[in-house]
UniProtKB/Swiss-Prot annotation:
Alphabetized Pfam families for the sequence: RBFA
HAMAP family: RbfA
Swiss-Prot/TrEMBL GO biological process terms: maturation of SSU-rRNA
Family affiliation: Belongs to the RbfA family.
The keyword Lyase is annotated on this UniProt entry: no
Gene Ontology molecular functions: ribosomal small subunit binding
Listed InterPro entries: KH_dom-like_a/b, RbfA, RbfA_dom_sf
Principal localisation: cytoplasm
Protein name: Ribosome-binding factor A
Lineage: Bacteria, Pseudomonadati, Pseudomonadota, Betaproteobacteria, Burkholderiales
Keywords of this entry: Cytoplasm, Ribosome biogenesis
Listed Gene3D superfamilies: 3.30.300.20
Subunit structure: Monomer. Binds 30S ribosomal subunits, but not 50S ribosomal subunits or 70S ribosomes.
Record localization: Cytoplasm
């Protein structure tokens, strides 16, 4: 007897639904003062739906304290998701601060700095600055 595999598309659909539901539930149901304005960036599910990595950004507040508070509230959020989702297994939630935005800003700053240094070096050498 062959086991039925879950399709990658279904995994993405469930992850997207969890992302939408968590965004709403955190805003309306979680009353922890350590949690400021939070945006759920993405949700990654294990193939068996047992665990979900939930990546968030925090517009206000300390990201570490926010992560701690969200992980503390994960059991409550799990129960609320169970009432909303119509799937057999609702995953255990693991919250992680998403540093993608900060890393992108830092990379942009480094690129600008490198370009301005290169232009300055070209000007000092008497060669025209090149645009790539």
């Amino acid at each position: 007897m062959s086991r039925k595999r879950t399709s990658p598309n279904r995994n993405v659909q469930i992850a997207d639904q969890i992302q939408r539901d968590l965004s709403e539930l955190i805003m309306r149901e979680v009353k922890d003062p350590r949690i400021g304005i939070v945006t759920i960036q993405s949700v990654e599910l294990t193939p068996d739906y047992a665990h979900a990595k939930v990546y968030f950004t925090a517009l206000t507040g300390d990201p570490e304290k926010t992560q701690e508070a969200l992980n503390h509230a994960s059991g409550h959020l799990h129960n609320l998701l169970f009432k909303r989702l119509h799937i057999h297994t609702v995953p255990t939630l693991h919250f992680h601060y998403d540093q993608t935005i900060e890393k992108a800003v830092e990379m942009s700053r480094l690129i600008k700095e490198a370009n301005s240094t290169r232009a300055k070096d070209d000007d000092e050498a008497g060669a025209p600055a090149q645009d790539d």
